[in-house]
Amino acid sequence: MTCVNVCFFLFPPCHRNKITEADKSLVDLLIPSLCCSLAVFPSIPLINTHSNLCLFSNFSHSCFLFCTHPDTLPTSLSINPKKLSLSFSFPLSQKRPFPNFLHPFTGSELSLFRCLLLFFFFLLFFLSFSFSFSFLFFLSQIFIVYFSSFPILHFLFFFFLCVCVFLSFLFSLSHLLSLAILFLPLLLRVFSTLSRLPRLFCLCLQKKRRVLIPFAFTSFRKIASLPCVC
């Protein structure tokens, strides 16, 4: 992981001791907007629930610290506070990064999810194999009832039944592997996205609640001392 400081100047040096009402309104709008956009919008190469999206503020500038993968690190960053915009520049040979849905897993979450997937696929395998075996057993009962007077046919049918059971086992196993190959990435994406939503929702709420404090009762240094919620 590579951490990047994204800084932008809110106040010139002459405004260090005199913050105007326009500056207060700008900060009230800008800081929560960037907090939520960095955490939610997929166009930003941040999407990582375990990274530090921390706000560092003082009288001269505000900085956002966020982490990206080394191969998705932008070459330049620019922020326009007046338009509430944040732009990135990437190399021509590099594709625009998209969220890595597998990264938000911790070790314990990934181990638990793998156990659940293993149980789910074994359950599918058991159901598929039991259905095939039950169908063949039903056929064998019909055969025994209608052809009980031919012993040689009993032996042939028993051999045929063993072959069919083995083939059904192979078919169930191949079906299980194909399901795992096809649906495992999708299930991982769905699970990681669902696990991400409450954190992102709380992140936005807590950022807005902790940052949007009336400037008559606090200061930038008090805002800077607030704990990070990411």
UniProtKB/Swiss-Prot annotation:
One GO CC term on file: cytoplasm
Compartments, record wording: Cytoplasm; Nucleus membrane
Residues spanning the signal sequence: 1-16
Membrane-topology descriptor: Multi-pass membrane protein
TM annotation in the entry: 27-47, 118-138, 150-170, 172-191
Coiled-coil boundaries: none
Keywords: Cytoplasm, Membrane, Nucleus, Signal, Transmembrane, Transmembrane helix
Record-given protein name: Uncharacterized membrane protein C17A2.10c
